[in-house]
């Protein structure tokens, strides 16, 4: 029988550039890497998350899936994001900075230029960049195959 390790505090994991490939967040895959995430834990995605691209069935599927995860995903905008769609969500205060709750308290966009206090640590959200693969940094959402 496996013995569960008791942790005294939450964990903060950092990754980036998921580009809509959310298989790395499956419980089975996380367990294989030794990660047993709880409701106190956070995963910070440093840009190009890929969730908010179009409000379609895929978006709804992933929203439902992430809402059922025990942990919270925090995400900073990258250069491949649908900024118009993100802008539809209201700005709110959270842990000292401005955020947009994309999926209730499960997926939270950390606004650029903000400082957040999370578990006694300070995090500065510095996201976005010019797109080397999109002319002028402007994309027609309907013509771009994302992810």
What are these model-derived regions, one by one?
Residues 2, 7-8, 15, 20-118:
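Core catalytic region of metal-dependent phosphoesterases/phosphodiesterases
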Residues 12-20, 141-146:
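Acidic/glycine-enriched edge-of-secondary-structure segments
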Residues 105, 119-147:
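Active-site-proximal loop/helix segment associated with metal-binding centers of metalloenzymes
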């Amino acid at each position: 029988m496996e013995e569960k390790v008791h942790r005294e505090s939450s964990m903060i994991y950092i990754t980036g550039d998921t580009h809509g490939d959310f298989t790395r967040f499956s419980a089975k895959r996380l367990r294989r890497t030794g990660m047993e995430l709880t409701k106190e834990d956070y995963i910070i995605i440093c840009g190009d998350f890929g969730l908010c691209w179009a409000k379609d069935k895929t978006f709804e599927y992933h929203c439902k899936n992430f809402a059922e995860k025990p942990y919270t995903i925090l995400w900073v905008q990258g250069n491949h994001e649908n900024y118009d769609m993100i802008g539809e969500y209201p700005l709110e205060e959270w842990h000292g900075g401005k955020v947009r709750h994309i999926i209730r308290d499960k997926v939270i966009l950390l606004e650029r230029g903000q400082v957040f206090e999370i578990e006694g640590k300070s995090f500065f959200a510095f996201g976005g960049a010019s797109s080397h693969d999109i002319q002028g940094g402007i994309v027609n959402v309907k013509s771009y195959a994302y992810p």
